[in-house]
A protein has these predicted regions:
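Long amphipathic alpha-helical segments
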Residues: 1-87
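Short glycine/serine/threonine-rich phosphate/pyrophosphate-binding segments
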Residues: 53, 118-123, 147-148, 167-176, ...
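C-terminal binding/interaction regions
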Residues: 113, 158, 192, 196-229
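Glycine-rich oxoanion-binding loops at beta->alpha junctions
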Residues: 97, 135-156, 201-202, 218
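Short, acidic/small-residue loops that bind anionic groups at enzyme active sites
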Residues: 88-90, 177-201, 215
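Glycine-rich phosphate/diphosphate-binding loop of Rossmann-like nucleotide-binding domains
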Residues: 106-148
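Glycine-rich phosphate-binding loop
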Residues: 152-190
């Protein structure tokens, strides 16, 4: 009847007037981020105070029963685990997460590294993509110093919907992959290398200046950014 309709309209008005973030004083949780961009807010754990991290983690978990944090330390993991025993921590990628079981994943992303030293950044990309619903094929240590290693996995790489190329040193892997596949290549320069690599700047400049088509470049060591894209 009209009264019930009016009540429902008032409830709807109250809901839409609610701020699209949760005020915490030291933080403003972006509760509508998934509505706007398709994926919920992620915690950048580095340099956060313990009390702040724990409260942010708790409130994000209360929203949807899932939380994903990047650049977490071992002590931060121990802090979160005291309250959330189910939390999972990967010391290689420094990812901290609680993830729903039996999550459906689609497509295939090939995450490739030039060397073993690049795997920590690659895992940040791979686990981010998996958390947000993609299947990931890991293809590690296939850099240009032994191009035959890359060519031995070319069929798998070419069958992917997207390729992530993670490389330090001179960063040539992204250009090589860009010339071999007809899919988007997301290039991730890493800070791996000797003096003149300038903590990843050399690889970044190589990737930005690539003559191969279809390459997009994220910031140095930004595996999360690549996995999100």
């Amino acid at each position: 009847d009209e009264m019930n309709l009016l009540i429902e309209m008032m409830k709807a008005e109250k809901y839409f007037k609610k701020e699209p973030f949760e005020e915490m004083g030291y933080a403003k949780l972006d509760t509508h981020r998934e509505i706007r961009s398709g994926f919920p807010e992620v915690i950048f754990c580095a340099r956060k105070a313990d009390a702040h991290l724990l409260e942010i983690f708790t409130r994000l978990y209360a929203q949807d029963g899932e939380v994903f944090g990047t650049r977490a330390s071992e002590p931060q993991y121990e802090l979160i685990r005291e309250k959330f025993p189910e939390v999972v921590y990967d010391p290689l990628s420094h990812i901290l997460k609680i993830e729903k079981k039996d999550k459906k994943r689609i497509g295939k992303i090939a995450v490739c590294t030039a060397g073993t030293a690049d795997i920590s950044v690659a895992e940040e990309a791979a686990q981010t993509a998996e958390y947000f619903g993609a299947n990931v094929e890991r293809i590690y240590d296939v850099g240009v110093s032994g191009i035959h290693r890359l060519l031995s996995r070319l069929d798998t790489i070419q069958s992917a919907n997207c390729v992530v190329a993670v490389a330090g040193m001179e960063g040539a892997l992204a250009s090589v992959l860009g010339g071999l596949v007809d899919k988007p290549v997301i290039a991730v320069p890493t800070s791996v290398g000797y003096g003149a690599s300038m903590n990843g700047l050399s690889a970044l400049l190589t990737m930005i200046n690539s003559c191969a088509n279809g390459i997009a470049v994220v910031n140095i060591d930004n595996g999360y950014g690549a996995g999100y894209i």
